[in-house]
Amino acid sequence: MASVFSPVKEMSPEEYKRVTEVTYLGVVYGTLAALKRMLPRNRGTIVQVGSALVYRSIPLQSAYCAAKHAIAGFTDSIRCELIHDKSRVRVTMVQMPALNTPLFSWVKSRLKHKAQPVPPSFQPEVGARAIYWAAHHTRREVNVGWPSVEAIIGNKLAPGLLDRYLGKTGFASQQTCEPENPSRPDNLWQPLKGDYGAHGTFEQRARERSWELRASLGRSWIGAGVAAIAAAVWLASRRG
């Protein structure tokens, strides 16, 4: 994926085009390639990696947010077409929170201070477990971490209030106190050399587990438990 941390007024048309080509069209082209193999076999699951930003855009990442919105729209269209065709191929989206990945070390940035994942952040293994689970189940969407749930609820109930909140907090929450090096290399136009691994530089603050994810993946069991409790209460009231 590609992104740019920058105010809109400082972005160039070329940068928007590049982020769109890599982050959005990369998903489109990959999906088309997968469908060529999967449709004749009439089975399989395509897992699209989304973000909490699918539901709520934030300042300083306009190109990336727009690309993630586009991925969601593209995925919804595919899903409807597969249902119409009675295909057994499934499409799911895994909505990620902020993850401790090397993104923040190589992303192009015009910020005064180094970029950081918006707290609370999670280790990449949390996201990997969600993707693996989604590939083996038929869930339409999987939300990883409270930030994804918060974005959905907040933008549905009070989008205007969220605008003002992010206008006041969204700049500082995406930056550390450490000054950015304006001459450091980035991966917008070409990959950087070397293996950056899967983890970023925010090991101490990244969570290794997501209780929200556990609740989401186990919601059928939770529902069964609630139903069992309700049935027990009803029986007790009848006996009383």
What function would you assign to each model-found segment?
Residues 33-42:
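A short helix-coil junction within the Rossmann-fold of NAD(P)-dependent oxidoreductases
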Residues 31, 67:
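Active-site helix of classical SDR
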Residues 51:
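Residue(s) in the substrate-gating loop at a strand-loop-helix junction
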Residues 7, 57-65:
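Active-site loop-to-helix junction immediately N-terminal to the catalytic Tyr of the SDR YXXXK motif
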Residues 84-178:
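SDR active-site lid
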Residues 215-239:
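Hydrophobic alpha-helical topogenic segments used for membrane insertion/localization
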Residues 7-8, 12-17:
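Substrate-binding pocket helix/loop in short-chain dehydrogenase/reductase
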